[in-house]
UniProtKB/Swiss-Prot annotation:
Protein's name in the database: Phosphoribosylformylglycinamidine cyclo-ligase
Enzyme Commission number(s) from the entry: 6.3.3.1
Annotated gene: purM
HAMAP family for this protein: AIRS
Keyword Nucleotide-binding assigned: yes
SUPFAM superfamilies: PurM C-terminal domain-like (SSF56042), PurM N-terminal domain-like (SSF55326)
Native source species: Vibrio cholerae serotype O1 (strain ATCC 39315 / El Tor Inaba N16961)
Pfam families in the record: AIRS, AIRS_C
Principal subcellular localisation of the protein: cytoplasm
The UniProt record lists the keyword Cytoplasm: yes
Length: 346
């Protein structure tokens, strides 16, 4: 070493290993609450281990990864970090239930320019809360402190989930047929999609996020955590013949419903079967957004759309409502020509 130059450390370069260790200690309790019996070992290993549940005869693993998009920018601006982790889990696990899978474990990636232990602990505690709601284990993760890559207190998160489904019980839309009923399961708000348009509407309209709307502020409506449909969804799948499930995320109705429909079929949606929650009405009015664009960008109050035999529809709605969900018959499956759109909203 040169005697004239100071001795540099990783901390001098902007990476605080001690802060990372402090974060691990802070989140251990939250992570432990999510543990499933299949999980082997604890935090700190190079890899996380998980056995397959023994109840499955022909288990198929189902994986998913997602983020929360620019909803995160809104959370950062409002300094509210405790529910963004729930959003992260929801966006991943809800994609698994679409195929009938039970989530087993979840991993997270948290990246920031300068690690704030309090903020990171809030986010990861939210992830643990989401995992508890979904019944999956938070089995590991990565916290990356990357000076020069993020501005100020900014951070980003990504999630990764693995679930399991019996091979013979995979839901892939192949059983959908003309005459099937379509059931909607209500959302808690925009969930985690369309937030670039949300932020543009806020900017152009100069709206105040503290303005009150139906008993809550606009900001509270917009940061409402994404609903997690795992427990109600698994119960529904166990008791009814589910032909398809569509998770209404980015691309809205027009893009997500066709993903689970076979050729020659279309979803006919009764647009009068529900009233859009007030936040969607507010967004449409403030942004002068066309109804077509609303259905293309937002869930408009519908988190899942489920296809099943018509004679099971009422019982399925009753089951979902008993599980605490808002649910209703929203339409049906009809025959479609090859040149027709696969979604029709009346």
């Amino acid at each position: 070493m040169s005697g004239n130059n100071p001795s540099l450390s990783y901390k001098d370069a902007g990476v605080d290993i001690d802060a990372g260790n402090a974060l691990v200690e802070r989140i251990k309790g939250a992570v432990k609450r999510t543990r499933r019996p299949e999980v082997m070992g604890g935090l700190g290993g190079f890899g996380a281990l998980c056995e397959l549940p023994t109840k499955y005869k022909h288990p198929v693993l189902v994986s998913g990864t997602d983020g929360v998009g620019t909803k995160l920018r809104l959370a950062l601006d409002m300094k509210k970090h405790d529910t963004i982790g729930i959003d992260l889990v929801a966006m991943c696990v809800n994609d698994l239930i679409v195929q009938g899978a039970e989530p087993l474990f979840f991993l997270d990636y948290y990246a920031t320019g300068k690690l704030d232990v309090d903020t990171a602990a809030e986010v990861i505690s939210g992830i643990a809360d989401g995992c508890l709601q979904a019944g999956c284990a938070l089995i590991g993760g990565e916290t990356a402190e990357m000076p020069g890559m993020y501005e100020g207190e900014d951070y980003d998160v990504a999630g990764f989930c693995v679930g399991v489904v019996e091979k013979e019980e995979i839901i892939d839309g192949s059983k959908v047929q003309v005459g099937d009923a379509l059931i909607a399961v209500g959302s808690s708000g925009p969930h985690s999609n369309g937030y670039s348009l949300v932020r543009k509407i806020l900017e152009v309209s100069k709206a105040d996020k503290n303005e009150r709307l139906a008993g809550k502020t606009i900001g509270e409506h917009l940061l409402a955590p994404t609903k997690i449909y795992i427990k109600s969804g698994l119960k529904l799948i166990a008791e009814h013949d589910i032909h398809a499930i569509s998770h209404i995320t980015g691309g809205g109705f027009w893009e997500n419903i066709p993903r689970v429909l076979p050729e020659g079929t279309k979803a006919v949606i009764d647009g009068k079967s529900w009233e859009w929650p007030v936040i969607f009405q507010w967004l449409q009015e403030k942004g002068n957004v066309t109804t077509h664009e609303m259905y293309r960008t937002f869930n408009c109050g519908v988190g899942l759309i489920i296809a099943l035999p018509k004679d099971q529809a009422n019982a399925a709605v009753a089951l979902l409502q008993a599980e605490g969900e808002t649910a209703w018959v929203i339409g049906e499956i009809a025959a479609a020509n090859s040149n027709e759109a696969q979604v029709e909203i009346n």
